[in-house]
Amino acid sequence: MTVYPTYKDSGIEWLGQIPTHWELTRISSVLTEVKDLNTSLRFSHPSQFKFGDIILKPDVNIEDVSSLSKCIIFRKDDILINGLNLNYDFVTQRIARANYSGIITSAYIAVRVRNNLSSKYVTYLFKALDSRKVFNGLGTGIRLTLTYKELKKYYILLPPQEEQRQIVAYLDYKSNKINERICQRERESYKLYLN
């Protein structure tokens, strides 16, 4: 972990000290809500959340045009948030970054990064916040639902672009190492199973 020469109080109790040259900025100033609906039926196959990824739904009734036209259109690198039923403490992995363009139910939040921000950095940051159940405390209503209207009021930690790139590269590297280990263990288990 990098040690910086000087730190400042973030003003956020759970966050504590941050490097002096990092900023805290309102989410609404760096992320834009994606609201484009699929009214022209440009896309005919909706996507869904699955363990922190966005995948195409396996079973789709493409004749249900009315539901397809109400889906939001997301683009590659948009960030999707499942803000539904936050009061159920499941490990749902509510954050995903789109690897392709497509459509998804408008019940989810889709955001697009503006200048000076890496979508991969925001995804990692939001996944870290999700793992600590930070989003659970932001929901409203009986079923604790998070909306962009509520999300945009909060702040995001914003290091300079080069540091965002370094953070993403480090986390990508570590994630790949973990995935390699998992694959290795699965292969070993499979060999034991066959014997």
Language model regions located:
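Non-catalytic DNA-recognition/assembly elements of restriction-modification systems
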Residues: 6-38, 153, 161-165, 173-180, ...
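A short beta-sheet element
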Residues: 72-131, 147-148
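A structural connector/turn signal
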Residues: 63, 68-69, 141, 153
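A short glycine-rich beta-alpha junction/loop motif
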Residues: 6-10, 102-107, 140-165
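Short amphipathic alpha-helical coupling segments at ligand-binding clamshell hinges
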Residues: 121-125, 170, 181
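Residue-level recognition of short, solvent-exposed, well-ordered loop/turn junctions
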Residues: 23, 57, 63, 69, ...
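DNA target-recognition patches
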Residues: 7, 28-65
